[in-house]
Amino acid sequence: MEKKKVVLAYSGGLDTSVAIKWLQEKNYDIIALCLDLGEGKDLAFVKEKALSVGAIKSYMIDVQEEYANEYALIAMQAHTLYEGKYPLVSALSRPLIAKKLVEIAEQEGASAVAHGCTGKGNDQVRFEVSIQALNPYLEVIAPVREWKWSREEEIAYAKENDIPIPINLDSPFSIDQNLWGRSNECGILEDPWAAPPEEAYEMTLALEDTPNKPEFVEIGFEAGVPTTLNGTAYSLSELIKTLNALAGKHGVGRIDHVENRLVGIKSREVYECPAAMTLITAHKELEDLTLVKEVAHFKPMIEQKLTELIYNGLWFSPLKQALNAFLQETQKNVTGTVRVKLFKGHAIVEGRKSEYSLYDEKLATYTAQDEFNHDAAVGFISLFGLPTKVYSQVNQKKVEA
Protein backbone atom coordinates (compact mmCIF):
# COMPACT_ATOMS: atom_id res chain seq x y z
CA MET A 1 0.00 0.00 0.00
CA GLU A 2 1.32 3.45 -0.93
CA LYS A 3 2.04 5.62 2.06
CA LYS A 4 0.16 8.88 2.55
CA LYS A 5 1.91 12.10 3.51
CA VAL A 6 1.15 14.08 6.65
CA VAL A 7 2.62 17.42 7.71
CA LEU A 8 3.19 17.52 11.47
CA ALA A 9 3.51 20.70 13.55
CA TYR A 10 6.74 19.70 15.28
CA SER A 11 8.16 21.26 18.45
CA GLY A 12 10.98 18.85 19.24
CA GLY A 13 9.33 17.81 22.49
CA LEU A 14 8.27 14.36 23.62
CA ASP A 15 4.69 14.46 22.31
CA THR A 16 5.45 15.40 18.72
CA SER A 17 8.57 13.20 18.60
CA VAL A 18 6.51 10.20 19.68
CA ALA A 19 3.85 11.29 17.18
CA ILE A 20 6.31 10.80 14.31
CA LYS A 21 6.77 7.11 15.17
CA TRP A 22 3.06 6.67 15.90
CA LEU A 23 2.12 8.13 12.50
CA GLN A 24 4.69 5.89 10.79
CA GLU A 25 2.87 2.90 12.26
CA LYS A 26 -0.32 4.28 10.69
CA ASN A 27 1.39 4.09 7.27
CA TYR A 28 2.21 7.78 6.91
CA ASP A 29 5.32 9.51 5.65
CA ILE A 30 5.88 12.42 8.01
CA ILE A 31 6.99 15.90 6.99
CA ALA A 32 7.91 17.89 10.09
CA LEU A 33 7.30 21.63 10.27
CA CYS A 34 8.85 23.85 12.93
CA LEU A 35 8.30 27.61 12.97
CA ASP A 36 10.55 30.22 14.55
CA LEU A 37 8.09 32.49 16.36
CA GLY A 38 10.75 34.13 18.47
CA GLU A 39 10.80 31.63 21.32
CA GLY A 40 14.59 31.50 21.39
CA LYS A 41 15.02 27.73 20.93
CA ASP A 42 17.79 26.06 18.92
CA LEU A 43 15.56 25.32 15.96
CA ALA A 44 18.37 23.92 13.81
CA PHE A 45 18.63 21.16 16.40
CA VAL A 46 14.85 20.67 16.33
CA LYS A 47 14.90 20.38 12.54
CA GLU A 48 17.59 17.69 12.66
CA LYS A 49 15.89 15.87 15.52
CA ALA A 50 12.74 15.39 13.44
CA LEU A 51 14.78 13.65 10.75
CA SER A 52 16.60 11.48 13.28
CA VAL A 53 13.30 10.36 14.81
CA GLY A 54 11.89 9.35 11.42
CA ALA A 55 10.51 12.27 9.40
CA ILE A 56 11.24 12.06 5.66
CA LYS A 57 11.59 15.84 5.44
CA SER A 58 11.92 18.64 7.98
CA TYR A 59 11.16 22.31 7.52
CA MET A 60 12.25 25.16 9.78
CA ILE A 61 10.73 28.50 8.78
CA ASP A 62 11.47 31.88 10.37
CA VAL A 63 8.09 33.63 10.66
CA GLN A 64 8.98 36.17 13.32
CA GLU A 65 8.36 39.24 11.17
CA GLU A 66 5.15 37.81 9.71
CA TYR A 67 3.94 36.95 13.19
CA ALA A 68 4.79 40.41 14.49
CA ASN A 69 3.18 42.36 11.64
CA GLU A 70 0.14 40.25 10.81
CA TYR A 71 -0.81 38.82 14.20
CA ALA A 72 0.77 40.54 17.22
CA LEU A 73 0.23 43.98 15.69
CA ILE A 74 -3.51 43.39 15.36
CA ALA A 75 -3.63 42.22 18.97
CA MET A 76 -1.83 45.36 20.10
CA GLN A 77 -4.02 47.71 18.07
CA ALA A 78 -7.14 45.97 19.39
CA HIS A 79 -5.83 45.94 22.99
CA THR A 80 -6.76 42.26 23.17
CA LEU A 81 -6.78 41.21 26.82
CA TYR A 82 -8.90 38.09 27.31
CA GLU A 83 -10.99 38.52 30.46
CA GLY A 84 -9.16 41.80 30.98
CA LYS A 85 -5.81 40.11 31.61
CA TYR A 86 -4.38 37.74 29.00
CA PRO A 87 -2.84 39.25 25.82
CA LEU A 88 -3.45 36.06 23.78
CA VAL A 89 0.18 34.86 23.69
CA SER A 90 -0.59 31.31 22.52
CA ALA A 91 -3.90 32.00 20.80
CA LEU A 92 -2.24 34.43 18.38
CA SER A 93 0.36 31.98 17.11
CA ARG A 94 -2.01 29.10 16.35
CA PRO A 95 -3.61 30.50 13.17
CA LEU A 96 -0.16 31.24 11.73
CA ILE A 97 1.02 27.70 12.50
CA ALA A 98 -2.17 26.35 10.90
CA LYS A 99 -1.61 28.54 7.84
CA LYS A 100 1.93 27.22 7.36
CA LEU A 101 0.79 23.62 7.90
CA VAL A 102 -1.73 24.03 5.09
CA GLU A 103 0.78 25.75 2.80
CA ILE A 104 3.38 22.98 3.21
CA ALA A 105 0.72 20.27 2.88
CA GLU A 106 -0.43 21.73 -0.43
CA GLN A 107 3.15 22.20 -1.60
CA GLU A 108 4.10 18.61 -0.71
CA GLY A 109 0.88 16.97 -1.90
CA ALA A 110 0.05 15.75 1.61
CA SER A 111 -3.44 14.48 2.37
CA ALA A 112 -3.31 15.30 6.08
CA VAL A 113 -1.85 17.57 8.73
CA ALA A 114 -1.25 16.74 12.38
CA HIS A 115 -0.73 18.57 15.67
CA GLY A 116 0.34 17.59 19.18
CA CYS A 117 -2.58 18.95 21.20
CA THR A 118 -4.39 17.07 23.93
CA GLY A 119 -8.15 16.64 24.09
CA LYS A 120 -8.75 19.14 26.89
CA GLY A 121 -7.03 22.31 25.71
CA ASN A 122 -8.02 25.27 23.57
CA ASP A 123 -5.31 24.74 20.97
CA GLN A 124 -6.91 21.70 19.34
CA VAL A 125 -9.90 23.90 18.50
CA ARG A 126 -7.75 26.77 17.25
CA PHE A 127 -5.69 24.54 14.97
CA GLU A 128 -8.51 22.51 13.53
CA VAL A 129 -10.97 25.35 12.95
CA SER A 130 -8.21 27.35 11.24
CA ILE A 131 -7.17 24.41 9.06
CA GLN A 132 -10.78 23.78 8.05
CA ALA A 133 -11.14 27.44 7.09
CA LEU A 134 -8.01 27.36 4.93
CA ASN A 135 -8.43 23.93 3.33
CA PRO A 136 -11.55 21.96 4.27
CA TYR A 137 -10.35 18.91 2.33
CA LEU A 138 -7.30 18.17 4.46
CA GLU A 139 -7.58 15.44 7.08
CA VAL A 140 -6.55 16.58 10.56
CA ILE A 141 -4.90 14.04 12.87
CA ALA A 142 -4.39 14.59 16.60
CA PRO A 143 -2.16 11.71 17.80
CA VAL A 144 -1.96 12.77 21.46
CA ARG A 145 -5.74 13.05 21.63
CA GLU A 146 -6.17 9.68 19.96
CA TRP A 147 -3.64 7.52 21.79
CA LYS A 148 -4.82 8.53 25.31
CA TRP A 149 -1.58 7.36 26.93
CA SER A 150 -0.44 8.38 30.38
CA ARG A 151 2.88 10.23 30.59
CA GLU A 152 4.52 7.04 31.83
CA GLU A 153 3.16 5.01 28.90
CA GLU A 154 4.34 7.66 26.45
CA ILE A 155 7.87 7.61 27.91
CA ALA A 156 7.94 3.82 27.77
CA TYR A 157 6.90 3.93 24.09
CA ALA A 158 9.65 6.47 23.38
CA LYS A 159 12.28 4.28 25.04
CA GLU A 160 11.11 1.19 23.15
CA ASN A 161 11.50 3.07 19.86
CA ASP A 162 14.79 4.84 20.67
CA ILE A 163 13.18 8.26 20.67
CA PRO A 164 15.32 10.76 22.63
CA ILE A 165 13.76 11.87 25.90
CA PRO A 166 14.02 15.68 26.37
CA ILE A 167 16.35 16.66 29.21
CA ASN A 168 13.70 18.98 30.69
CA LEU A 169 11.08 16.25 30.94
CA ASP A 170 11.17 16.36 34.74
CA SER A 171 10.09 20.01 34.73
CA PRO A 172 6.61 20.28 36.26
CA PHE A 173 5.66 23.12 33.92
CA SER A 174 4.12 23.21 30.45
CA ILE A 175 5.52 26.25 28.65
CA ASP A 176 4.70 27.99 25.39
CA GLN A 177 6.69 31.01 24.27
CA ASN A 178 6.90 33.37 21.31
CA LEU A 179 7.63 37.03 20.59
CA TRP A 180 4.44 38.20 22.28
CA GLY A 181 5.16 36.47 25.58
CA ARG A 182 5.39 33.27 27.57
CA SER A 183 2.67 31.08 29.08
CA ASN A 184 3.21 28.58 31.88
CA GLU A 185 0.86 26.03 33.43
CA CYS A 186 0.82 22.70 35.32
CA GLY A 187 2.75 21.61 38.40
CA ILE A 188 2.20 23.74 41.48
CA LEU A 189 0.44 26.32 39.29
CA GLU A 190 -2.59 24.02 39.18
CA ASP A 191 -3.30 25.05 42.78
CA PRO A 192 -4.86 28.53 42.47
CA TRP A 193 -3.95 29.27 46.12
CA ALA A 194 -0.24 28.53 45.65
CA ALA A 195 2.08 31.42 44.82
CA PRO A 196 3.97 30.87 41.55
CA PRO A 197 7.59 29.94 42.35
CA GLU A 198 10.26 32.18 40.91
CA GLU A 199 11.44 29.36 38.63
CA ALA A 200 8.12 29.64 36.81
CA TYR A 201 9.35 32.93 35.34
CA GLU A 202 12.02 33.55 32.73
CA MET A 203 11.34 36.81 30.88
CA THR A 204 10.79 39.07 33.90
CA LEU A 205 12.57 39.83 37.17
CA ALA A 206 10.88 39.62 40.55
CA LEU A 207 10.02 43.07 41.91
CA GLU A 208 12.59 42.59 44.68
CA ASP A 209 15.30 42.18 42.05
CA THR A 210 14.32 45.01 39.71
CA PRO A 211 16.30 48.27 39.56
CA ASN A 212 15.51 50.88 42.20
CA LYS A 213 15.62 53.63 39.59
CA PRO A 214 13.00 53.92 36.82
CA GLU A 215 13.89 53.69 33.15
CA PHE A 216 12.18 55.80 30.50
CA VAL A 217 11.48 54.68 26.96
CA GLU A 218 9.95 56.71 24.14
CA ILE A 219 7.92 54.59 21.72
CA GLY A 220 7.25 56.04 18.28
CA PHE A 221 4.15 55.01 16.32
CA GLU A 222 3.21 55.50 12.67
CA ALA A 223 -0.42 54.82 11.74
CA GLY A 224 -0.78 52.56 14.76
CA VAL A 225 2.46 50.65 14.17
CA PRO A 226 5.31 50.93 16.71
CA THR A 227 8.42 51.80 14.72
CA THR A 228 11.00 53.34 17.09
CA LEU A 229 12.36 53.03 20.62
CA ASN A 230 14.12 56.12 21.95
CA GLY A 231 14.45 57.40 18.40
CA THR A 232 16.03 54.25 16.97
CA ALA A 233 14.11 52.49 14.19
CA TYR A 234 13.49 48.75 14.44
CA SER A 235 11.64 46.10 12.51
CA LEU A 236 8.55 45.19 14.51
CA SER A 237 9.87 41.81 15.62
CA GLU A 238 13.14 43.37 16.82
CA LEU A 239 11.29 46.20 18.55
CA ILE A 240 9.20 43.66 20.47
CA LYS A 241 12.30 41.67 21.44
CA THR A 242 14.12 44.80 22.59
CA LEU A 243 11.15 45.98 24.62
CA ASN A 244 10.73 42.51 26.14
CA ALA A 245 14.24 42.85 27.56
CA LEU A 246 13.80 46.47 28.71
CA ALA A 247 10.41 46.02 30.37
CA GLY A 248 11.16 42.52 31.64
CA LYS A 249 14.17 43.87 33.55
CA HIS A 250 11.70 46.04 35.49
CA GLY A 251 9.26 43.19 36.19
CA VAL A 252 6.61 44.48 33.78
CA GLY A 253 4.08 42.03 32.35
CA ARG A 254 3.65 39.29 34.97
CA ILE A 255 0.09 37.98 34.88
CA ASP A 256 -1.46 35.32 37.16
CA HIS A 257 -4.81 34.35 35.66
CA VAL A 258 -7.56 31.81 36.32
CA GLU A 259 -9.23 31.82 32.92
CA ASN A 260 -12.33 30.29 31.41
CA ARG A 261 -11.20 27.97 28.65
CA LEU A 262 -13.15 27.46 25.46
CA VAL A 263 -13.61 23.76 26.29
CA GLY A 264 -15.56 24.57 29.46
CA ILE A 265 -13.04 24.28 32.27
CA LYS A 266 -11.15 26.85 34.32
CA SER A 267 -7.37 26.87 34.07
CA ARG A 268 -4.76 28.72 36.12
CA GLU A 269 -1.89 30.05 34.00
CA VAL A 270 1.01 32.39 34.57
CA TYR A 271 2.00 34.71 31.73
CA GLU A 272 4.95 36.98 31.08
CA CYS A 273 4.27 39.66 28.48
CA PRO A 274 6.56 42.66 29.09
CA ALA A 275 6.53 44.09 25.56
CA ALA A 276 2.88 43.28 24.93
CA MET A 277 1.63 45.01 28.07
CA THR A 278 3.90 48.03 27.54
CA LEU A 279 2.88 48.46 23.90
CA ILE A 280 -0.83 48.03 24.59
CA THR A 281 -0.64 50.64 27.36
CA ALA A 282 1.28 53.13 25.21
CA HIS A 283 -0.88 52.59 22.13
CA LYS A 284 -4.09 53.13 24.10
CA GLU A 285 -2.77 56.46 25.41
CA LEU A 286 -1.89 57.62 21.89
CA GLU A 287 -5.38 56.68 20.71
CA ASP A 288 -6.85 58.74 23.56
CA LEU A 289 -5.02 61.72 22.08
CA THR A 290 -5.90 61.15 18.41
CA LEU A 291 -9.29 59.40 18.12
CA VAL A 292 -12.56 61.32 18.08
CA LYS A 293 -14.89 60.60 20.99
CA GLU A 294 -17.38 58.46 19.03
CA VAL A 295 -14.67 56.13 17.69
CA ALA A 296 -12.87 56.00 21.06
CA HIS A 297 -16.09 54.97 22.82
CA PHE A 298 -17.20 52.45 20.18
CA LYS A 299 -13.82 50.75 19.58
CA PRO A 300 -13.76 48.83 22.91
CA MET A 301 -16.84 46.87 21.79
CA ILE A 302 -14.97 45.80 18.65
CA GLU A 303 -11.91 44.99 20.75
CA GLN A 304 -13.92 42.74 23.06
CA LYS A 305 -15.39 40.77 20.16
CA LEU A 306 -12.03 40.47 18.39
CA THR A 307 -10.47 39.19 21.60
CA GLU A 308 -13.14 36.51 21.93
CA LEU A 309 -12.86 35.46 18.29
CA ILE A 310 -9.07 35.13 18.47
CA TYR A 311 -9.15 33.28 21.79
CA ASN A 312 -11.78 30.89 20.43
CA GLY A 313 -9.79 30.05 17.29
CA LEU A 314 -11.85 32.04 14.80
CA TRP A 315 -9.01 34.07 13.30
CA PHE A 316 -10.04 33.21 9.74
CA SER A 317 -13.77 33.77 10.29
CA PRO A 318 -15.66 36.34 8.17
CA LEU A 319 -16.55 38.33 11.28
CA LYS A 320 -12.93 38.64 12.37
CA GLN A 321 -11.96 39.90 8.92
CA ALA A 322 -14.78 42.46 8.98
CA LEU A 323 -13.89 43.72 12.45
CA ASN A 324 -10.24 43.95 11.45
CA ALA A 325 -11.23 46.23 8.56
CA PHE A 326 -12.84 48.59 11.09
CA LEU A 327 -9.77 48.36 13.30
CA GLN A 328 -7.43 49.37 10.48
CA GLU A 329 -9.61 52.37 9.63
CA THR A 330 -9.18 53.65 13.19
CA GLN A 331 -5.38 53.59 13.00
CA LYS A 332 -4.78 56.16 10.24
CA ASN A 333 -4.00 59.04 12.61
CA VAL A 334 -2.49 57.04 15.49
CA THR A 335 0.92 58.55 14.87
CA GLY A 336 3.13 60.07 17.52
CA THR A 337 5.40 59.36 20.47
CA VAL A 338 4.59 58.03 23.93
CA ARG A 339 6.95 58.29 26.89
CA VAL A 340 6.70 55.35 29.29
CA LYS A 341 8.26 54.95 32.73
CA LEU A 342 9.26 51.36 33.53
CA PHE A 343 9.48 50.82 37.26
CA LYS A 344 8.74 48.03 39.75
CA GLY A 345 6.34 46.03 37.57
CA HIS A 346 4.58 49.03 36.05
CA ALA A 347 4.60 50.63 32.61
CA ILE A 348 3.35 54.14 33.32
CA VAL A 349 2.68 56.62 30.52
CA GLU A 350 4.03 60.03 31.47
CA GLY A 351 3.79 61.86 28.16
CA ARG A 352 2.31 61.66 24.68
CA LYS A 353 2.44 63.86 21.58
CA SER A 354 1.14 63.67 18.01
CA GLU A 355 0.80 65.84 14.92
CA TYR A 356 -2.78 64.52 14.83
CA SER A 357 -3.51 65.39 18.46
CA LEU A 358 -7.11 66.46 19.06
CA TYR A 359 -6.14 67.99 22.38
CA ASP A 360 -6.22 71.80 22.07
CA GLU A 361 -4.58 73.46 25.05
CA LYS A 362 -6.24 76.79 24.26
CA LEU A 363 -9.64 75.11 24.60
CA ALA A 364 -8.71 73.00 27.63
CA THR A 365 -6.89 75.61 29.72
CA TYR A 366 -8.42 77.46 32.67
CA THR A 367 -5.91 80.32 32.35
CA ALA A 368 -6.35 83.71 30.70
CA GLN A 369 -5.46 82.09 27.37
CA ASP A 370 -8.78 80.20 27.41
CA GLU A 371 -10.52 80.36 23.99
CA PHE A 372 -13.50 78.15 24.86
CA ASN A 373 -16.85 79.89 24.24
CA HIS A 374 -18.49 79.69 27.66
CA ASP A 375 -21.62 81.46 26.41
CA ALA A 376 -22.36 78.53 24.08
CA ALA A 377 -22.82 76.25 27.09
CA VAL A 378 -26.27 77.63 27.98
CA GLY A 379 -27.87 76.71 24.67
CA PHE A 380 -26.07 73.38 24.54
CA ILE A 381 -27.31 72.39 27.99
CA SER A 382 -30.86 73.40 27.09
CA LEU A 383 -30.94 71.24 23.96
CA PHE A 384 -28.95 68.34 25.43
CA GLY A 385 -31.21 68.10 28.45
CA LEU A 386 -34.48 68.75 26.60
CA PRO A 387 -35.64 65.08 26.35
CA THR A 388 -35.06 64.59 30.08
CA LYS A 389 -36.87 67.84 30.87
CA VAL A 390 -39.91 66.93 28.73
CA TYR A 391 -40.08 63.45 30.26
CA SER A 392 -40.02 64.92 33.74
CA GLN A 393 -42.73 67.47 32.88
CA VAL A 394 -45.06 64.80 31.45
CA ASN A 395 -44.66 62.50 34.45
CA GLN A 396 -45.00 65.36 36.92
CA LYS A 397 -48.39 66.23 35.39
CA LYS A 398 -49.55 62.61 35.82
CA VAL A 399 -48.55 62.68 39.49
CA GLU A 400 -50.43 65.95 40.04
CA ALA A 401 -53.52 64.56 38.30
From Swiss-Prot:
ATP binds at residues 9-17, 116. It catalyses: L-citrulline + L-aspartate + ATP = 2-(N(omega)-L-arginino)succinate + AMP + diphosphate + H(+). GO terms for biological process: argininosuccinate metabolic process; L-arginine biosynthetic process; urea cycle. One of its GO terms (cellular component) is cytoplasm. It is found in: Cytoplasm. The keyword rRNA-binding does not apply. Keywords: Amino-acid biosynthesis, Arginine biosynthesis, ATP-binding, Cytoplasm, Ligase, Nucleotide-binding. This is Argininosuccinate synthase. Signal peptide: none annotated. Homotetramer. Belongs to the argininosuccinate synthase family. Type 1 subfamily. It is an enzyme of class 6 (ligase). SUPFAM superfamilies: Adenine nucleotide alpha hydrolases-like, Argininosuccinate synthetase, C-terminal domain. L-citrulline binds at residues 86, 122, 126, 174, 183, 259, 271.
